[in-house]
């Protein structure tokens, strides 16, 4: 058997790092319970919303998808959506992409979170401020009337909650149509403000994006991008963000590169 080159071994290791990230649910259409979730995400230590029955599997011509049901009058993943975090081998640059489809009756309300990326030993969401050592996070976020932004916790933030980097105000997310999300993060040199954040959203012939090239994600070289944040829920920190009616969204074709 021929020996693999060093470059080939690096590629093999990189491929194995992503192997734990499923592109779509493996099971048949129907309920997606904790057992099915564990089979797809065996390395995740916790979840919100799965055991409560807010996830299911649906089939589309392009493949299986996760369906998340958002509870009316509720915010956050523990009561009104779902969340889990999947670790992967740390990198200085990562691209996350997936397809999301909002239900025909989707209630944007004031806004809510979509799956994103994070890194570091701490939890930098929910008002827990990033300091360049404890970690960072960035998640796409829908806003009222279907506008959209990247919502980032980073070392350059000046308040406890994250900063909003908005797409053009004229942009509107559609309901009942596939939307392609592409989120790119490149970490800064620890002594420079040269990090990258790029969010690109496409549906049909419509594309919108926001880019920031002076992000300070970290202050230590050991901090790297190493988490997929599969989090989606309405909120916001009070019930004014809660949907007034039941609605859902589908997620599929999940990729890291």
Q: Where are the language model's segments positioned?
A:
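Hydrophobic h-region of N-terminal signal peptides that target proteins for export
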Residues: 10-19
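Bacterial N-terminal signal peptides that target proteins for export
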Residues: 1-8
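Low-complexity, Ser/Thr/Pro/Gly-rich disordered linker/stalk regions
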Residues: 20-257
